[in-house]
A protein has these predicted regions:
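Juxtacatalytic substrate-recognition/specificity segment
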Residues: 2-110, 124-129, 139, 146-150, ...
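Glycine-centered structural positions embedded in regular secondary structure
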Residues: 67-69, 116, 164
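Generic structural signal for hydrophobic core residues of well-folded globular domains
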Residues: 100, 104, 121-124, 171-175, ...
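Active-site cradle of extracellular carbohydrate-active enzymes
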Residues: 114-122
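Scaffold signal of the M16-like zinc-metallopeptidase fold and its non-catalytic homologs
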Residues: 134-137
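Pan-zinc metallopeptidase signature
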Residues: 142-215
Length: 215
């Protein structure tokens, strides 16, 4: 258990305390970086379940292309994780952002906003997302991405993540991260998404969707 930022590490499989310490250190880095940008920090400890064997996919039932999951706990496979430190940092940051979104927005946050925010903060920039979008003209609307991404095949899901990344980056460019936080808080109070979006981003949701689709 970390004595700094609120993380508790559990194991599914053989325990590895040295690995747990390294992962908590990297989570704490994400905690301060993301928390500082959003001025929001989880008040309750976050449990992190590390799958040290091949049990991760059996337990979470996620598609093969997923790297980890957040369902109230951060869950991730860790075999060989320290051999890919950059990727480990990105995955941990991504899932930590999901924990922050859950705290701020509750259950009413569209998937594209949740995943887009996590993707923006995990990466140094959005260049990879833009390169992927430049190679395809078949893109879903943001309205179509309010639900789970787990239905499409991996290629379609990659486009969904890229479009979500672009959309959230545009929101931040337009009104800043605090406006996104306020939108999440509106949703936690049960606010209508389109109305809350227009109030916080100062743009109709329909117009924003068109802007994101044509860029």
């Amino acid at each position: 258990e970390s004595r700094g930022a609120p993380f508790t590490v559990l194991f599914e499989g053989p325990a590895d305390e040295a690995l747990a310490r390294r992962i908590v250190e990297r989570l704490e880095s994400a905690y301060w970086r993301v928390g500082g940008a959003l001025t929001a920090y989880p008040a309750k400890p976050i449990s992190v379940v590390l799958y040290t064997t091949e049990q991760f996919r059996d337990v979470t039932r996620l598609p093969e292309w997923t790297a980890a999951a957040y369902d109230g706990r951060i869950r991730m496979p860790v075999r060989g994780a320290l051999e890919q430190i950059d990727r480990l940092d990105r995955v941990l940051c991504h899932e930590f952002v999901h924990a922050v979104v859950a705290m701020l927005g509750g259950r009413n946050v569209p998937t594209w906003l949740n995943e887009g925010l996590a993707s923006v903060f995990e990466a140094k920039d959005t260049a990879d997302a833009e390169r992927l979008l430049a190679r395809t003209s078949a893109r879903p609307t943001l309205q179509e991405l309010h639900g789970s991404f787990f239905g499409p095949p991996a290629g379609d899901a990659a486009i969904a993540y890229a479009l979500s990344t672009r959309a959230v980056q545009r929101m931040i460019d337009l009104r800043g991260a605090p406006a996104v936080v306020q939108l999440l808080q509106d949703l936690a109070r049960g606010g209508d998404f389109a109305a809350a979006f227009q109030q916080r981003i100062s743009m109709r949701y329909e117009d924003f969707q068109s802007m994101v689709a044509r860029q």
